[in-house]
């Protein structure tokens, strides 16, 4: 029997952060660290996934995430197929299953899935033989975003444990927030969510976070300020009185940022709504904003995840 290539991470898929243990997260981050350094060198391309096929199956538009996964796979030498599917064409679970069966017949090695419905990636994982990576499912999880955020923080701060992190804004509709809460609390950070009452989900405190409805109090003394995009496309009803009022009370500007630690990092998963959840002055702060670095770390993290899952899949095939 062949040994698992990456024994620190033995899952066939990456469907979420919830359920992982610290050693698994650390293994993925350590592997991503190698690629982060390699990606800054002249020779970025390798052959760890030569002969492997990655299908990007996106039922929601996401140029940034899809491009990041595509670049990651190509830098590992994989063949990449991008399938952009309008969410309206997959209205029933049976149709999604039919899609899975069809793709499975093509024998891909990795399926990267983004879908508007929570649990879609997990459903596909039950129907295919390849590895499945959840690239975002509804408001549920976005595991590679949390991993790239963690890598960005660890590279700047040297650790995750013991840090105070404020996740601010539209937590209700944010899969990024949920995955980050799972990962950061797992790794020993203290997490607080900050936002207006309508945008903070009920029961969020059960995940081990503190809750603040006052932005200034929520930012006081934190090491990391993670802003979230206001997701108007997912809102039905009046969650905020106006964009102008939202920015006044919950938008990140110099005045509010001054309440965080002097060396606090500014983060945002993108795309940003400048003048809504974040002011351009702080978003572009050369010393403290790591928003562009998050994009850079996204490629490294996705290279690590793709390599680990495809490598272990190969080990399972020869077992």
UniProtKB/Swiss-Prot annotation:
Keywords for this entry? Pyrimidine biosynthesis, Transferase
Residues involved in L-aspartate binding: 92, 175, 229
Q: Which residues does carbamoyl phosphate bind?
A: 64-65, 114, 142, 145, 270-271
Please name the GO terms that the record assigns under molecular function.
amino acid binding; aspartate carbamoyltransferase activity
Output this protein's name.
Aspartate carbamoyltransferase catalytic subunit
Query: EC annotation?
Result: 2.1.3.2
Q: Pfam families of this UniProt entry?
A: OTCace, OTCace_N
Task: Write down the HAMAP family for this protein, in alphabetical order.
Answer: Asp_carb_tr
Task: Name the catalysed reactions.
Answer: carbamoyl phosphate + L-aspartate = N-carbamoyl-L-aspartate + phosphate + H(+)
Biological processes annotated in GO: 'de novo' pyrimidine nucleobase biosynthetic process; 'de novo' UMP biosynthetic process; amino acid metabolic process
Give the record's subunit note: Heterododecamer (2C3:3R2) of six catalytic PyrB chains organized as two trimers (C3), and six regulatory PyrI chains organized as three dimers (R2).
Briefly, what is this protein's role?
Catalyzes the condensation of carbamoyl phosphate and aspartate to form carbamoyl aspartate and inorganic phosphate, the committed step in the de novo pyrimidine nucleotide biosynthesis pathway.
Which InterPro entries does the record cross-reference, listed alphabetically? Asp/Orn_carbamoyltranf_P-bd, Asp/Orn_carbamoylTrfase, Asp/Orn_carbamoylTrfase_sf, Asp_carbamoyltransf, Asp_carbamoyltransf_Asp/Orn-bd
- Please, which domain of life does this record's source organism belong to? Bacteria
Q: Does the keyword Transferase apply?
A: yes
Organism of derivation:
Rhodospirillum rubrum (strain ATCC 11170 / ATH 1.1.1 / DSM 467 / LMG 4362 / NCIMB 8255 / S1)
